[in-house]
């Protein structure tokens, strides 16, 4: 795939995973080692029959950040929602900060995790882009108004109506626990707009880190229209930095590593 083809394909973050699956030097070849199955769901045969979703998880109960097993209920699947049986959830350093209250007072118990992949096991009546059995991923957001100017322009994190819901720790009166709960769990309910399809030729455990770390380093390349011959500085070659270096666009760019 040449540079022009890549640039034409990368018109939105929703094409990101598809590109990573088709370009030989794609980011999934990083084989990131910080994913692990959180709940052994592979043998489960889940059938949603309506009502709240019983969920098993690992949660923080105080600012120690220690995670312990916890069972709770999620809100019912709405008309525009999908229910995902989670297979893998990556560990992001921001999970640790939030669970320890480093960014302000937290509501506990709280289930972290915002790099989530799994299998769709139920869909709302208005959902057309997913069906039961599809492979799906979820990042750091699960809902917004989708009607304001920011949402319509793909900036749901800046929802003008202040209805952005992040994947965990956000107040949500629809949830039995009063807040959103994340991906270190067996299941998650998410508005279909905030889920992406995971291509069949990406291993689920390798796709998970792309839902935050991968997209975080991908987005600025697109926002600033990085082109062949441009110089890009990568500050630190850690969890995000090494994924930045493996972005397919980087084969056309001079890379400056800042340690």
Where are these regions (language model features)?
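Short Gly/Pro-enriched turn/cap motifs at secondary-structure boundaries
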Residues: 48, 73-74, 107-113, 175-180, ...
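C-terminal segment of N-terminal export signals and the immediately downstream linker at the start
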Residues: 30-71, 85
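Glycine-rich beta-strand-centered segment in the early N-terminal region that forms part
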Residues: 75-89, 102-152, 157, 197-201
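Cytochrome P450 core scaffold surrounding the K-helix E-X-X-R motif
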Residues: 94-96
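Mid-domain Rossmann-like dinucleotide-binding core that forms the NAD(H)/NADP(H) cofactor-binding site
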Residues: 199-259
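N-terminal export leaders
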Residues: 12-29
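N-terminal secretory signal peptides
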Residues: 1-11, 15
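Cysteine-cluster motifs in flexible loop/terminal segments that predominantly coordinate metals
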Residues: 140-193
């Amino acid at each position: 795939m040449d540079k022009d083809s890549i640039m034409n394909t990368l018109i939105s973050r929703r094409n990101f995973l598809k590109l990573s699956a088709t370009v030989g030097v794609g980011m999934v070849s990083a084989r990131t080692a910080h994913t692990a199955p959180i709940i052994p769901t592979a043998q489960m045969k889940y059938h949603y029959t309506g009502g709240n979703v019983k969920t098993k998880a690992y949660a923080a109960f105080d600012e120690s950040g220690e995670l312990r097993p916890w069972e709770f209920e999620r809100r019912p699947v709405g008309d525009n929602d999908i229910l995902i049986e989670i297979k893998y959830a990556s560990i992001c350093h921001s999970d640790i900060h939030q669970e320890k209250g480093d960014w302000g007072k937290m509501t506990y118990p709280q289930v972290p995790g915002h790099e989530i992949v799994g299998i769709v096991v139920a869909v709302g009546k208005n959902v057309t882009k997913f069906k039961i059995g599809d492979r799906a991923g979820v990042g750091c957001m699960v809902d917004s108004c989708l009607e304001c100017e920011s949402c319509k322009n793909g900036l749901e994190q800046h929802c003008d109506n202040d209805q952005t819901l992040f994947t965990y720790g956000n107040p949500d009166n629809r949830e039995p626990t009063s807040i959103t709960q994340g991906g270190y769990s067996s299941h998650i309910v998410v508005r279909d707009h905030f889920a992406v399809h995971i291509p069949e030729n990406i291993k689920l455990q390798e796709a998970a880190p792309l839902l935050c770390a991968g997209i975080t380093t991908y987005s600025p390349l697109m926002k600033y229209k990085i082109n062949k011959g441009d110089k890009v500085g990568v500050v630190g070659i850690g969890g995000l930095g090494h994924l930045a270096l493996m972005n397919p666009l980087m084969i056309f760019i001079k890379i400056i590593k800042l340690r």
